[in-house]
């Protein structure tokens, strides 16, 4: 398979596939006599795993670790679960932070009259000045 075929099968761009090769996530494919990359089913399987890992938020380094585990016949499910648990905890922390940011923005929006006047409590909050009865919070 050439890069355009594997890109279609995996829904990845050729650029992403070359990046994953460059970063060592996939083994370099063999080259045809004309210099084109020739991919195998193992490449497809590895790239699909990488794509799924990326969709759930794994970094390239984390994808590489998951790929190593996936291709290790001696892996334990405990090791795989630990990696997934770490990612879940990271995402949970980020969600909490985003929830606080969302609440802050909701408060600021509610405090702003949104009229033609130049006074804006949102700007005052962003400048760090206290206005009205709103509290300055930093998420």
Curated annotation (Swiss-Prot):
Single annotated GO MF: DNA binding
GO biological process annotation, one example: positive regulation of DNA-templated transcription
CDD domains xrefs: HTH_CueR
Primary subcellular site in the record, as a coarse category: cytoplasm
GO CC annotations on file: cytoplasm
Residue ranges the UniProt entry marks as DNA-binding: 4-23
Record-listed Cu(+) binding positions: 112, 120
UniProt keyword annotations, A-Z: Activator, Copper, Cytoplasm, DNA-binding, Metal-binding, Transcription, Transcription regulation
Coiled coil: none
Segments forming domain HTH merR-type: 1-69
Compartments where located: Cytoplasm
Domain of life: Bacteria
A Pfam short name: MerR_1
Domain comment (free text): It contains a N-terminal DNA binding region and a C-terminal metal binding region.
Function, in words: Regulates the transcription of the copA and cueO genes. It detects cytoplasmic copper stress and activates transcription in response to increasing copper concentrations.
PANTHER family in alphabetical order: HTH-TYPE TRANSCRIPTIONAL REGULATOR CUER (PTHR30204:SF16), REDOX-CYCLING DRUG-SENSING TRANSCRIPTIONAL ACTIVATOR SOXR (PTHR30204)
Assembly: Homodimer.
The name this protein goes by in its record: HTH-type transcriptional regulator CueR
């Amino acid at each position: 398979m050439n890069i355009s075929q594997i890109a279609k099968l995996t829904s990845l761009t050729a650029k992403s596939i070359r990046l994953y090769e460059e970063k060592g996530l996939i083994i370099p494919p063999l080259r045809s006599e004309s210099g084109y990359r020739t991919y195998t089913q193992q490449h497809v399987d590895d790239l699909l795993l990488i794509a799924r890992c990326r969709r759930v938020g794994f970094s390239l380094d984390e994808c590489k670790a998951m790929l190593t585990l996936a291709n290790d016949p001696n892996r334990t499910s405990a090791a795989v679960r630990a990696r997934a648990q770490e990612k879940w905890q990271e995402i949970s922390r980020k969600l909490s932070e985003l929830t606080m940011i969302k609440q802050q923005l909701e408060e600021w929006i509610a405090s702003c009259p949104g009229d033609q006047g130049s006074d804006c409590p949102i700007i005052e909050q962003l400048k760090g000045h206290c206005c009205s009865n709103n509290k300055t919070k930093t998420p």
